[in-house]
């Protein structure tokens, strides 16, 4: 009996350790209907942005949303609209951490926002090329740039494929892919 209790306690400890490790992981799998993309995020460089992203992921927020904006030779953007181009309700905006030294180079992951530098919520984009004009160059709102918080480590071919999709205007939004790119899920690995 005592050995069984020890075995149960050991298994419980291992399960809790594995769950804790998964929560600390900085690697995520973005499953789409067009293929999978694996990303790595950088909490030491963009702690608030990564915490924000992890919160949305843990709540299943991105499941069923789409990459709603695709601009060839620029970027692909998702994380805010469903298949019917209805915007999903988000949490409050976060502070822009674009001064972290990370650059908007090809296959980096950055926060999308409005003209207000501190308006990013759930939407993100993947740079298809080096987009230096999106980098932080100063503290004024016209120079603050877009916060990079991760990069694609697998599935660059999928990113490139999505980046070449034909687009149209739908519900007042331009650059919407004609072929839907659905985020089935984003899972922490």
Model-derived regions: residue spans:
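Bacterial N-terminal signal peptides that target proteins for export
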Residues: 1-9
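Bacterial N-terminal signal peptides
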Residues: 8-17
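Cyclophilin-like peptidyl-prolyl cis-trans isomerases
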Residues: 7, 20-189
């Amino acid at each position: 009996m005592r050995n069984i209790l020890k075995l149960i306690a050991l298994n419980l400890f291992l399960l809790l350790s594995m769950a804790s490790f998964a929560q600390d992981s900085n690697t995520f799998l973005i499953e789409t209907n067009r293929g999978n993309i694996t990303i790595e995020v950088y909490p030491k460089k963009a702690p608030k942005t990564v915490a924000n992203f992890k919160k949305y992921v843990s709540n299943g927020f991105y499941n069923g949303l789409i990459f709603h904006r695709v601009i060839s030779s620029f970027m692909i953007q998702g994380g805010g609209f469903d298949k019917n181009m209805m915007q999903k309700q988000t949490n409050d905006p976060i502070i822009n951490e674009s001064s972290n030294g990370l650059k908007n180079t090809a296959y980096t992951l950055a926060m999308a926002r409005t003209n207000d530098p501190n308006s990013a919520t759930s939407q993100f984009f993947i740079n298809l090329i080096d987009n230096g004009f999106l980098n932080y160059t100063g503290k004024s709102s016209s120079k603050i740039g877009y916060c990079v918080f991760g990069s694609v480590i697998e599935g660059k071919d999928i990113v490139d494929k999505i980046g070449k999709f034909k687009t149209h205007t739908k519900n007042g939004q331009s650059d919407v892919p004609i072929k839907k790119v659905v985020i089935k899920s984003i899972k922490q690995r």
